[in-house]
Design a protein with these regions (language model features):
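Aromatic (phenylalanine/tyrosine) cluster motif
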Residues: 10, 18-19
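A short beta-loop-alpha structural element at the N-terminal edge
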Residues: 29-45, 51-55
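Conserved beta-strand in the GNAT
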Residues: 87, 93-102, 112
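Conserved acetyl-CoA binding element of GNAT-fold acetyltransferases
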Residues: 109-120
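Conserved acetyl-CoA-binding loop-helix of GNAT-fold acetyltransferases
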Residues: 118, 124-137
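Conserved beta-strand-loop-alpha-helix junction that forms the acyl-donor binding cleft
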Residues: 144-159, 163, 173-176
């Protein structure tokens, strides 16, 4: 079995360009690593992401009508070499984002696929699954995937992705947040 879903076509100006397999064979999907000049764009898209989880996270908006974003945390996506904020474009249109962080859990050497957000218009077409699979299967890094047990949509999505990966997937019991489901995707079997 091999990683499927997206095929790297070329790299141009820091942009990884992927093309999806069916069900949308004519669709161009681009995952582009952003720079600090794109912080406001990511911040704006993050508002939609925060809105979608506000019911089960029980988050309220601030006095300015926006969800809280920790500025120092957001800035790390352009300061820390293991962190990145990536913009998702579909046929040239902004369709979401992918946030990657270096895990800060003690004793765990892994990158974390921290947040994947796709606008509703582009969902249920296999794009999110293809992106997640491609990222988790790329290179030799170990990957951490975490999601809240209460988030039924994320739970269904990640179970589909993780159940079909050609790499070993290990369930982790971590003490930092008991509501989080934790999975480690490794390049090879753990000893």
């Amino acid at each position: 079995m091999q990683c499927i879903g997206l095929h790297t076509a070329f790299v141009n100006n820091g942009a990884l360009r992927f093309f999806t397999e069916s069900p949308m064979p004519e669709t161009t999907v681009e995952l582009i690593q952003t720079g600090p000049e794109d912080a406001e764009l990511i911040r704006n898209l993050y508002q939609y992401y925060a809105y979608e989880s506000s019911d089960w996270e029980q988050e309220d908006v601030e006095a300015d009508g926006r969800f809280y974003i920790h500025d120092e945390h957001l800035a790390r996506y352009w300061q820390d070499p293991q962190w990145s904020a990536n913009l998702l474009l579909i046929d040239g249109y902004i369709a979401g984002f992918l946030l990657i962080e270096g895990s800060e859990l003690p004793g765990l050497d892994a990158l974390e696929l921290a947040d994947l957000f796709i606008l509703k218009r582009y969902r249920r077409k296999g794009i999110g699954r293809a992106i997640a699979s491609q990222v988790l299967c790329s290179g030799t890094a170990n990957w951490l995937v975490r999601f809240y047990d209460q988030d039924e949509v994320a739970q269904a999505f990640w179970r589909t992705v993780l159940d079909n990966l050609p790499r070993p997937v290990h369930t982790l019991e971590l003490d930092d947040d008991p509501q989080l489901m934790n999975y480690l995707i490794t390049h090879a079997a753990l000893h």
